[in-house]
Structure formats: C-alpha cells, structure tokens
Amino acid sequence: KKGDVFLSFRNLSLVILYRPGTNEIIWKSKPNKFFNQHDVDIVENNKISIFDNNMKHLFDGRRVDGNNRVVMYDFETDKYSTYLNKSMEREDVRTKLSGRSQILPNGDLAIEESGNGRFLYFSSKGELKWTYFNRASDNELYHLFWSRILYRNEVIVIVNNFLESMAK
C-alpha cells in the first residue's frame, strides 16, 4: 500500500513491512531465510528481492557461507527462492558487509559486491555480461556504495552499444 515502508534490520536478519499511518507491522520475514541482509527492492506488486550477505560466524573462520545471494519473496504464495544463485556462486560473489542487487525489468541482474569493490552485470539467463572493479591508480580496490543501473530506453541503447563494441 502507498506509504508502507520496508525496514531491514541487518543484525537481526529480519525484514519487516511497516505501515506508519497505523503504526502496525504488516509482515515480517521468517527466520533463517537470509543472514545480515541489505537492500530490499520491490520487484513486482507481489514480490520483493533482498540482497543476502549470507554472513555467519562459522567455526572454520569464514564469514560468508558459500556466496551472497539474491533472495526473492512472493507475498501471494508465501514462498522464498533465490535468483540466479548459480551465477553468483560461479563468480564467487561474497561481500561480508553492504552489497546491493537490482533486478531490472528485462530480468537482468546487477550486483554490487561493495566490500570487494566489484560490480557485476548478469543477463536474465545468468551469463556474466560485464564486471567493473573500482581500482585506483595505486592498483588498490576500493569499496563501492549505492551503485545502480539507470534503466531507461536511452540508457539501454547506450549499454547495448557498449556491450556490442566490447564483444568485437
């Protein structure tokens, strides 16, 4: 409903849908569906996506359990799923902190791996189309924050032309 707000409580691994007008919680996520998440996006009227850092304190010292994920929740079916997880696993996407995902209207997926200074762009079929590393002249990688794809027709033409030129 217009005016409702998604709130993401990272350290609780919890997302809620809050209605300020009535001061009520409309929905809250189930436990253990994601861990230390970021970036809730409305994908369709009945679906949201959540960037799952999948961060846990594991006995072997690892912090990210496998790879980061994009978790989808469907309000109509009350089901959770992942989006292009095999692609994220293949590219070893694993930022401990922060991170963003953006599912574009054509189904493509943009991922900001914030802590590793990497931005990835996947086709809707999971093919890695391009990667950007935020590398400075000293060859160090620097964090990325709040990257996004501007999805407008004129931008799509520019991106497609760029991708075609890179393929040659």
Question: Can you annotate each of these PLM segments?
Answer:
Residues K1-K168:
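Histidine-/acidic-rich catalytic cores in large beta-rich domains
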